[in-house]
Amino acid sequence: MTEIIQRKLNDSAFVRWTALILIALTMFFGYMFVDMMSPLQSMIEAQRGWTPDVFGMYGSSEFIFNVFGFLILAGIILDKMGIRFTGVLSASLMFIGASIKYYGVSDAFIGSGIETWLNSWWVSFPGSAKLASLGFMIFGCGMEMAGITVSKTIAKWFEGKEMALAMGLEMAIARVGVFAVFTISPWLANMAPATVVRPVAFCTLLLLIGLLTYVVFTFMDRKLDKQLGLDA
């Protein structure tokens, strides 16, 4: 009796490392967006009237929803819905939040009805900072959800293989985004005419690319699930 052994998708080193790169890019772009504004504090204070206190409150807004238990909810969603749904959801939240933040600091926001309304309450906190903080909150939810999703994804694709190496490499790729943005963000902002909007727009576009790379990964993961006999 001859036993036929089916080679699974993640048995191929090339395929599983390609999958890792696709999901790592999502995190790479996410980490770029997290720290994109850090080297631009003085510029946004000058161009949008923020104070150091306002900038500090904006920076902390990324974690507000997560402090109040969103990460627990994210874990429940991941267990119930799986890595494909949760990964696309998290990348979408990152892009949506980034888009809101982009609008908040853009020239189009200045003089708009939304700015007038946002400036009518909590007047010490500019409307642009309020909207940028809201976007950063939503982005932060997606970012932290993506973090646990990527960990579960690597555990699935690298089970019995180079799991620890894959986790370390994914984190290394993601953290390079922090290093890169401290060079890229000021360079983009200082191009004539100098503006904080340009690096925000650039990193928002990268998050859209990160969403698309994760969508590409979902097709690979669906094929792996079929090979494993799991529900597609």
Describe each model-derived feature in a short phrase.
Residues 18-52:
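Extracytoplasmic
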Residues 129, 135-172:
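Cytoplasmic helix-loop-helix junction between adjacent transmembrane helices
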Residues 92-124:
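C-terminal ends and interior cores of transmembrane alpha-helices
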Residues 60-76:
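Central cavity-lining transmembrane alpha-helices of secondary-active solute carriers
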Residues 218-232:
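Flexible cytoplasmic inter-helical loops of multi-pass small-molecule transporters
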Residues 31, 35, 124, 128, ...:
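Small-residue-rich segments within alpha-helical transmembrane domains of MFS-like 12-TM solute carriers
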Residues 170-222:
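Helix-loop-helix hairpin linking two adjacent transmembrane segments in secondary transporters
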